Amino acid sequence: MSKNTIVQLILITGLAGLLQAQNAYDAIHKIDNENGFGTRALAMGGAYTGLADDYSALYWNPAGLGYIRNSQFSVELSHLNFQNEANYSGAFSMDNQTYTRLRSLGFVRPVPTARGSCVIALGYNKISDYDENLHFSGYSSVSNGIGFYFTDENEESEFYLFDKNVLRTEQISSAGGLHHWSLAGAIALSPQFMAGVTVALITGKEEYNFHFSQRDINDLFNVYPGDIDEYEINQYLISDIRGLGIKLGGNLQLSRWLRLGGTIKLPTYLTVNETYSSDDLITFDDGSDDGVEDSGRWKYTIKTPYYFDGGVAFTGHFLTLSASARYRDWSQTQFSIPKNQLAEADYRDLIIENSIIRNDYRETIEYRLGGEIKLPFLRTNLRGGYAYFPNPLMESDKTQDKQVYTGGLSLIVDHNINLDVAYLYSDWSRVSKDQFTPAGTLENIFLSKIIIGLSYSF
């Protein structure tokens, strides 16, 4: 037989199918890490629905813009450290990456009115991150189903497994996020009630890199022509995302010290255009190799569910306390399938994925708490907060929920300029698996983020 004529790779799923087939995870992943922006807001745990009264109200509650009395210009940068400790087949690995991003750039302008308030705002804001990484290596005796057909000169073929008792290595990195190019406005409908709306052009990009290899380190696969030394695969996927989002907000001044806020985020259709390429390579014991390459494009649309925010804030002379919650039913996320494409098998598969989302995901309530202490003699405000994000998977346990601990401070540089700093820390665990590592990998993730913001009022 000639091992230079590989005619087919038999995997758990085909290589092209692995890259093209969208699944329930893809739909949820595009929207499940929304953390917003705003140095003050995030330093207070994101408990900002009832309190929002700066440029970041454009995201948290557009009605809060109505409390702004001076024009504002603001800019923010973030620095993320993502550390992933992985346990695969009893072998521990650690991967650590950092990502520095422009977080927001925006402008707020009160419009002169005879009475009440009218304020507009516009700007760019990064509201979610796709930045993460994973690396592990370990010996596994669990079959992943990988095997190959080899043909000889007489076109006779024979199948050879290369599926277990090998050293496996996997490395995954993802970078990018969702961005809002937003226009918002707020008006006073009464002396106690503000209403607002934000319209956001949503753009996003995710660059996904995947590398997997498995080696016969004990020379167990040594019978020609199945004397395979190593199999490796590389995948590269770019996802471009477009959509239009609308958020409605209201804020009620219950008393001089107490405010109540709420928002409704309307469903959004996110169109995803994916470009992928892949290559895989078999290396034999004698050093020869053979492989295949593949590439293509894919387009699909995700419909996101409603979500509802509610919050309350107490503001005193020296102390501010706030709390908020967000309700979302993840099971209402779905792939939107045009009627004229139901005849195509790939799109019919998305109907099955919609059923999986409906059955495997659940409704959640996120909650956030925050506080701020003013120290006028130091021209400084100290902030702290906490946020809790339940895992949307129906069968997940508490260790997979995210808890975020936050803190920060604000320095009055001069009468019109504020420098704000926020620090966010969270850790959680998850079990990940794919076609190549069916036994699964336990990941312990530690995330820390520093956000620096500068605002100018005039």
Residue ranges and their predicted role:
Residues 75-76, 83-94, 99-107:
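General structural concept
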Residues 1-25:
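Bacterial Sec-dependent N-terminal signal peptides
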Residues 23-48, 66-83:
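Transmembrane beta-strand segments of Gram-negative outer membrane beta-barrel proteins
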Residues 47-52, 60-71, 110-113:
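Outer-membrane beta-barrel pore proteins
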Residues 65-67, 72, 77-79, 105, ...:
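Glycine- and aromatic-enriched membrane insertion/assembly motifs of diderm outer-membrane
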Residues 55, 85-89, 335:
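Short, glycine/acidic-enriched capping/hinge loops at junctions between secondary-structure elements
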Residues 22-42, 103-458:
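Outer-membrane beta-barrel porins/channels
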Residues 42-56, 92-94:
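Asp/Glu-centered strand-loop micro-motifs enriched in Gly/Pro and often flanked by an aromatic residue
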